[in-house]
Each structure stands twice: as C-alpha cells, then as structure tokens.
C-alpha cells in the first residue's frame, strides 16, 4: 500500500494483503483512530483516512468536517453566494479577545446583583446623598463599596419599624403572668442593654423568695420595671408570707407553701449537723473496715491437697 504524503499510516492495509503491521487482522469497528474526526467514523466502517485530513488541518479547523456539508454549501452558494462571501469576509478580520468563561460570568453576575441592590436602595430610600467618594475611586465604583453600609441600614430600619409596631401601652394594668407583661424585651445584635438588664434583675431578685422563683423561671426581671420602683420587701427568706405588700404598683405576695431552701441555707444546715454529731459521718467507714479485713483473712490462705493437683497439671504428664 502506497501512503500519500498527507495520510496517517493505516494499521490495516486491506483484506487481501499481509504487509500491514497486524497482518490480515483489522481494528474492530468500534475503535476509532486518534486523528480522524468522530463524525465520519460513526457512519462508515474503518478505512484509510482521506487525503484532506492532516494534523495541521485538525488543529486549524477541528469543528466542522467540510466534506460532509459540501453539497449543502453548494446549494446555498447557488441561491445567494454573493451574500455569504461578503458576510464571511466581514466577520474574519474582527480581533478576538480571549477570556475564561467563568471569569466573564462571575463579573456579569456580580454586576447584575449590585445593580439590583442599587435599584432596591433607591426604592427604599437608603441612598446616601452626602456621600463623598474616595480619591482613588470613580463614582461608579463607590456605589458598589456602599452596599454593605446600605444593608446594615436596612437591617436597622427594619428592627426600628418592628419596635414601633408593638405599642408599649397595650395594657394599663399588669397581667398575672410575666409572659404577658406590656414591656417587650428587645433583642438585637447591636443592643448592649441586655447585660445591664440581667445584672439589675439579679440584684432585684434577692429581695424575696417569690422573686427568686420568678427570676429563675423567666430570666432578668427587667420587664416589671415599667410600673415604677420596686417595693423593698422587709421579710426574711424563711418567713412564710403573712401579708401582701401592696405599697407598689402591684401586689407582691410571697408563696405560703413549702419553699425551696437556698443553697446557702443547705450549706449552713450541713455545717451545723457536722458540728452537732461528727460520729454519724465517720461511723460507716469504721464499721466497714474490720468486716472487709475479716473476709480477706478468710479467703487468703489456699491449702492445696494432693488430690487437687491433677486439676492444675497438664494432661500430658
């Protein structure tokens, strides 16, 4: 087989000749050569490559095999060949700027989101009129740098609106449960009042046992502070409450049933017990120690008889 200058050497030389690399064997139809375009190999069986395929050709125009669409191109040319040639000539000399698609898409997406944010800013009235741009930045760029500030403003405005919607004078008299008390506790990232409120709540909670219970169940008792200064209850914590203290804005009545002892009281009671009878705590270990020793003395000696040795010796002896 004579190879033309543009061809790649075929592995199979033909059915009749045995000069090929593999003799009479040919490559199975499913395997494709590296240099051929896949469109041709899908339709026709394996054959030596046509003369117009070259390695340099493949690099320059790999997308469309021209032989396949030659007939279509001829028909188009017969209809309006002049228009086609003119359009081809006009499109060829345009310079091509190469860029990664991912970077282009990223910049497009960023720009689009920023523009939509600015639209929203204008609608919500968040734009800063007295804003002066940085020396090194254009006015276009400074709009994008203000996005974080505008988002922060938006959050602050929304929280303010929520707080205004909840009127503080819903109830003129306090309700029985602390959950429905009129002052709403404001929660936010930027509020630094929570720590001070909890401090005052813990200070106030030491006045009476009922308020201790409230503080443990509800948290800081800062929400009861709407009704004026809190009345000081001059009763000891162990006293069962006999009369309600009605001098303040609402009745403070201590719980008459069984009250939880505070941890300090528990510690004091334990200390007094220890002082009264120290033998109670030291007696159990003293009682246990001799019995344990007695048991150990009983179980310690092992006297093996001669008849028991056959259990301990291996069977081969």
Swiss-Prot record:
Pfam families named in the record: P33MONOX
Alphabetical UniProt keywords: Cytoplasm, NADP, Oxidoreductase, Phosphoprotein
Enzyme Commission no: 1.-.-.-
A molecular function GO annotation: oxidoreductase activity
Function: Potential NADPH-dependent oxidoreductase.
Family per similarity comment: Belongs to the P33MONOX family.
Protein name, UniProt field: Putative monooxygenase p33MONOX
Organism: Danio rerio (Zebrafish)
Gene assigned in the entry: p33monox
């Amino acid at each position: 087989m004579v190879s033309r200058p543009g061809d790649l050497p075929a592995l199979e030389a033909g059915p009749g000749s045995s000069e090929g690399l593999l003799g009479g064997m040919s490559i199975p139809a499913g395997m494709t050569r590296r240099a051929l375009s896949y469109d041709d190999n899908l339709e026709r069986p394996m054959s030596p490559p046509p003369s117009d395929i070259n390695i340099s050709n493949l690099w320059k125009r790999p997308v469309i095999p021209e032989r396949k669409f030659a007939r279509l191109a001829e028909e188009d040319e017969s209809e309006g060949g002049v228009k086609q040639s003119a359009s081809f000539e006009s499109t060829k000399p345009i310079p091509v700027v190469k860029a990664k698609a991912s970077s282009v898409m990223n910049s497009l997406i960023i720009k689009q989101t920023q523009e939509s944010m600015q639209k929203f800013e204008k609608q919500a009235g968040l734009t800063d009129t007295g804003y002066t741009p940085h020396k090194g930045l254009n006015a276009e760029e400074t709009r994008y740098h203000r996005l974080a500030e505008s988002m922060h403003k938006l959050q602050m405005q929304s929280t303010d609106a929520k707080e205004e919607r909840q009127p503080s004078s819903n109830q003129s008299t306090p309700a029985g449960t602390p959950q429905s008390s009129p002052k709403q506790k404001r929660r936010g990232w930027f509020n630094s009042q929570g720590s001070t409120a909890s401090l005052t709540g813990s200070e106030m909670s030491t006045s009476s046992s009922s308020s201790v219970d409230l503080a443990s169940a509800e948290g800081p008792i800062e929400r009861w502070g709407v009704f004026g200064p809190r009345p000081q209850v001059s009763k000891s914590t162990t006293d069962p409450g006999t009369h309600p203290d009605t001098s303040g804005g609402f009745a403070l009545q201590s719980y008459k049933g069984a009250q939880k002892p505070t941890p300090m009281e528990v510690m004091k009671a334990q200390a007094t017990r220890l002082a009264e009878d120290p033998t109670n705590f030291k007696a159990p270990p003293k009682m246990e120690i001799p019995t344990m020793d007695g048991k150990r003395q009983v179980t310690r000696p092992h006297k093996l008889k001669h008849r028991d040795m056959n259990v301990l010796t291996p069977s081969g002896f």
